[in-house]
UniProtKB/Swiss-Prot annotation:
<keyword id="KW-0408">Iron</keyword>
<dbReference type="GO" id="GO:0005829">
    <property type="term" value="C:cytosol"/>
</dbReference>
<dbReference type="GO" id="GO:0005506">
    <property type="term" value="F:iron ion binding"/>
</dbReference>
<dbReference type="InterPro" id="IPR036390">
    <property type="entry name" value="WH_DNA-bd_sf"/>
</dbReference>
<keyword id="KW-0238">DNA-binding</keyword>
<keyword id="KW-0479">Metal-binding</keyword>
<keyword id="KW-0804">Transcription</keyword>
<feature type="domain" description="HTH rrf2-type">
    <location>
        <begin position="2"/>
        <end position="129"/>
    </location>
</feature>
<feature type="DNA-binding region" description="H-T-H motif">
    <location>
        <begin position="28"/>
        <end position="51"/>
    </location>
</feature>
<dbReference type="InterPro" id="IPR000944">
    <property type="entry name" value="Tscrpt_reg_Rrf2"/>
</dbReference>
<comment type="function">
    <text>Nitric oxide-sensitive repressor of genes involved in protecting the cell against nitrosative stress. May require iron for activity.</text>
</comment>
<dbReference type="GO" id="GO:0045892">
    <property type="term" value="P:negative regulation of DNA-templated transcription"/>
</dbReference>
<feature type="binding site">
    <location>
        <position position="102"/>
    </location>
    <ligand>
        <name>[2Fe-2S] cluster</name>
    </ligand>
</feature>
<protein>
    <recommendedName>
        <fullName>HTH-type transcriptional repressor NsrR</fullName>
    </recommendedName>
</protein>
<dbReference type="Pfam" id="PF02082">
    <property type="entry name" value="Rrf2"/>
</dbReference>
<keyword id="KW-0411">Iron-sulfur</keyword>
<dbReference type="InterPro" id="IPR023761">
    <property type="entry name" value="Tscrpt_rep_HTH_NsrR"/>
</dbReference>
């Protein structure tokens, strides 16, 4: 399964925020600079992450963005569920004439479930804790 760039950059943005001290705010501009992604694209991603509670956004002069909850409580599977369209096939009887007898959708759904269960066994904190190479690459002190 390949994640969309939306989910990929959502995970990267969360990893960046998780690598910062818990009370430190960052900005969308800073995140886009670190990853070289379009600001407009990142704004949409951060808005979605904010809607589901993974990011807190504060407006104003001293505003910015930061994790909406502790990194150790954010499971990677939950992030993917919030950002990724998880339907792998378009099973519509007008589109595919084998839909009534097809078993492929069930197998694919089980594969997605297994994938998400594996991601659920890892948190955002697991991605950043004791990872000095990551901090160096992200230029985080």
């Amino acid at each position: 399964m390949q994640l969309t760039s939306f989910t990929d950059y959502g995970l990267r943005a969360l990893i960046y925020m998780a690598s910062l001290p818990p009370d430190k705010m960052t900005s969308i501009s800073e995140v886009t600079e670190v990853y070289g992604v379009s600001r407009n694209h990142m704004v949409k991603i951060i808005n979605q992450l904010s809607r589901v509670g993974f990011v807190t956004a504060v407006r104003g002069k001293n505003g910015g963005i930061r994790l909406g909850k502790p990194a150790e409580t954010i499971r990677l599977g939950d992030v993917v569920r919030a950002l990724e369209p998880l339907s792998l096939v378009n099973c519509n009887s007008t589109f595919c004439h084998i839909t009534p007898a097809c078993r492929l959708k069930q197998v694919l759904q089980q594969g997605v479930q297994n994938f998400l269960e594996e991601l659920d066994s890892h948190t955002l904190a697991d991605m950043v804790e004791d990872n000095p190479s990551l901090y160096k690459l992200l230029l985080v002190e």
